[in-house]
Each structure stands twice: as C-alpha cells, then as structure tokens.
Amino acid sequence: MPSIRVAFRPVSLIIQKFGGTSVADPDRIREVADHVKRTRDHGNDVVLVVSAMGKETDQLLRLAEEVSETRPAREMDMLITAGERKAIALMCMALHDMDVQADSFTGSQAGFLTDTNHQNAKILTINPQRVQETIDAGRVAVVAGSQGVSTDNNVTFLGRGGSDTTAVALAHGLNADACELYTDVSGVFTTDPRVCDQARKLASISFDELLEMTAVGCPKPAMRSVEVARSYGVRLHVRSAFTWEPGTWVDKEENTMEKPIISAVVPDTSQAKVTISGVPDNPGVAAAIFRPLADQNVNVDMIVQNTSDDGVTDISFTLPTEQLAIGTEIVTNAAQEIGAAGVSTDDTIGRVSVVGAGMASNPGVAATIFETLSNEGINIGMISTSAIRVSCVVAKSDVEKATLVLHDAFELDKG
C-alpha cells in the first residue's frame, strides 16, 4: 500500500478511530467530540476516523433487500458508504459546538485509492494531502471509515471492519505517533470476558499473536487492520471508547528474556462443518472441491482428509456458519461432478484456540491442551496448528467449558 508520507512533527499526531457503537446516537457523538477536544487540550493533533452510527449499515442493507432483488454491487457501495458520510458531518458539527474547528472527508477526499472489487475493496495507495493540510491549519480532520474511490473513479466500500483499516492506513500515510482503535471493550483479553470472569486484559501483545486471535474468532480489531499494521510497523492501542484507562498495545514481538508461553484462549461458536463422503482418491479432486469455494469467497478453515479405503476417502472442512448455505450448495455440485457419495453438514460444532508466541519453543503445549480437554470429557473432532496456535473443533455445547478449563490450565488469570 504505497503512500505519500509526511515528515515527523514536534507535536504528537494521534489517529483515533471510533466504531458504530461509540457514535450510535447524538449523546455518544458529543462524548466522542469531547474526547477529541481533551486529547487536543493535552497538546496533540488528532485525525478522527468514524464508522456509521450504531446499526445504520445493517439498516441500509435491509432497506436494499426490501427495494431490490438484484442489488448491483456498485450501487450497494454508494448506499452503504452513505452511513459514514452522515456520521462525519454530524461529528464535525459536534466539534464546532465545542469550539474545535474540524473538516469532514470522505474516503475519496482523504486520498484512498482502491481496486474495483465492490463490497470488499482493497486499498492500493493513499495520498492524504488534504488531511495533512487540515492538520497543518490546526483543525481536526474527520475521515469516513471503510471507503475509498476505485481506479475507475467509483465509490468503494472496504467491507466490514474497514474503518479499523482506514485508521491504520492513515497512521502510516501521515507518519502518526499512535493509532488508537476505540471499541466497546477496554482492550485485548486473555479470553472473552463474557465467557470467563477471570479473563485478564493484556498490557501488550504481538502483531502475530493478535493476527492468530482474530483469525480464529476474536472479533476486534478487524484482522485486515492488524495485517496492515504489521506490514507497515504501525503501533496500535486498542482501548475502550467509554473510559480513559489504558488498553492493550499491539507491536512487534518484544525482545524479552522469557516470553509468556500462552497469551490467550479464543472461543468461537460461529463455525460449521461440511463433510464430503466417498470421494474418489484421485489427483485433482481436492482442487475440484475447493477452487469453486475460493471463487465464491467462502472462507474455508480446517481441512481433514481421512485415510483412503478401497480407493475412496472422506474430506471434512470448517467454514463460518453464515456461509454454510452457499458452501453446501457449491460442494454438492462439486461432489456430483467428481462422483462422490454425498455431502453432510453439522452446525453444532465450535472451536477453541490456544495462542501464544512462546508455544514454538515449548513442545508440551499441545499435550496439555489435549489432556485438559480429555479430563473434562470434551471430545476433539478436528485439530489445526500454526507455529503459535493450536485450534480444536469441539461440540458447540462444550466451547464455554473448554475455554474455562484451558484458561485455568495455562494460568492466564495470573499474568
């Protein structure tokens, strides 16, 4: 993502991103404006990135479904990005009422050039010159999240979670001193606080660890934004939109003498499983199954192929539950073409993942996971690993218990 970057300045420049929950109504918009004012009063320049208010994006999507059966992608991007344009205008009005001069910018005005992939556009370059001019004039730049303009001069939507990516890209392009992602939680925790009362907020975590966490179910920040931050060395501060307490810093792996073996346990109940039975054990059959899924942007995660028996095998994979219907349709067609026996689905599964940078140098982690789950009578259906993660598919009804016992086994409540 090439960009035109500005030189370092003596006054700190902070990028602050607030999501839809944080700007859901007029009172919260004024609270965010007050937060920005206080940040400036402490001697900082601020660029503010905001999402659409509350559930406005969902409401616009429902409205489109009521109006149209075809819903052309170009027009959907025009519609969806209207939510952010509304939010930035209202935010500037609130700031002006507090004697803070501010200018609003759409993604296009802020210099975001994207590809032509409507609904999920990728940033190609950023030239935030107009934003920089506003900063230099002593004003606050308020930028619409999750949008840009394509190479063929059409408005584009960056997809869900794109406001985080907008903020990180601006932090890189403007050479900002910090990029603060404000959410409805106070940082990154050792597990979901709604599941485990003993969940502990992490003071810091590495990009690699957070990427693994977001890939297996941690909802915030958006995975794309962490990827961009890691690629361009943008240090992140994930913190609460409703308090001034410090959150979690995300940076390159710290060069400490002894790193924690495990940083987090991540529960995920949004997964389903598809099994293709009686698959001919021939070259090319796996590609015939998974290429059509990739072409339709179906997000396949774990894949297991059984040992061949009499020239046939079974292949199982997991995918998000929201993509189960389209995934099943695609796989059923592929199964018929390759002569497989049939397709079955299971939406009663879940996943629990253990993540930690110290895992690579501690070979006993996997054994501890398996023993802990076995002692609780929790059956493991599938396993996948990376250098710093082990994920297990279990029954959805066992996800909470698995999370609690693994969090306890690795003593994550003790810090």
Outline where the language-model segments fall.
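Glycine-rich beta-alpha junction loops
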Residues: M53, V185-G187, Y232-L236, S240-E245, ...
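A conserved regulatory-domain signal marking ACT and ACT-like small-molecule sensing domains
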Residues: G247-G415
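Nucleotide/pyrophosphate-binding catalytic subdomain
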Residues: M1-V226, T318, V394-A395, F410, ...
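Short phosphate-binding/catalytic loops that engage adenosine nucleotides
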Residues: N44, V100, V234, V298, ...
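Short hydrophobic alpha-helical runs that function as membrane-insertion/retention elements
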Residues: A178-Y182, L236-V238, D301, M382
